[in-house]
Amino acid sequence: MAQYGMIIDLEKCIGCHACAVACKAEWDVPAAEGRNWVKRLGPSMTADGLASTYYPGLCNHCDSPACVGACPADPVKMEFKDRKSGAAKIMEVAATWKDPFDGTVQIDKERCLGCGACAEACPYGARYVNPDLGEEGKADKCTFCTERTAVGLEPACVQTCLAGARIFGDLSDPDSAVAEYVKKGAIRLDSDAVKIGPNVRYYGRKRDLTLLAESCVPKIMPQASLRRVLLARLAKQVVKGARKNSLLDFFG
């Protein structure tokens, strides 16, 4: 199985936000939200010296994505196909899943409930509910521009990066550019509590990587809190649906 991933080279990133702007333009992302973001970190003192860098973030398309297990949508059987070999596999999935052939995490907007459970479950804050999609909104996030890569194009953020700081490819291919960065020491953003295998990695000076790791610690919402959020949102949808049906009956 391939595992698509991305390297962010912090030695090259200039914090211009062109990647985030390109993503918004490509996917019509609301102004207040972002599939991609760039945050300034520092200057701050670390154990490795004074550091100042940027945190370009996006969905990590994790090995064991917390968002997938959090989705409450009824599962259905779906057929997945490998772009290269043509091999097929049938899996039962909810409204979000990890593709068995390319390792990306995707969303079925038609079946998404808009409850936001997946967004709450993501330890990286990489998901949000887009209020412009459907009556109740739909979950949205970076897809690694799967529609673009399917026809041989790079993700919009990679193509637009002025400094060449974003590198996209197959991490499972030892000869790929992304795999070479891993060999050189590109790191994952994880923590003692969160080890779900993010497939976006960061490369740079040791002090900058230290600042990044200390500033951007992934956190998983406690299950009890997640359940409360989910139940509250689902209850809101049920009440709204009931009111709508009552009005239809009244005027029907």
Where are these regions (language model features)?
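Non-ligating segments of multi-cofactor redox enzymes
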Residues: 1-252
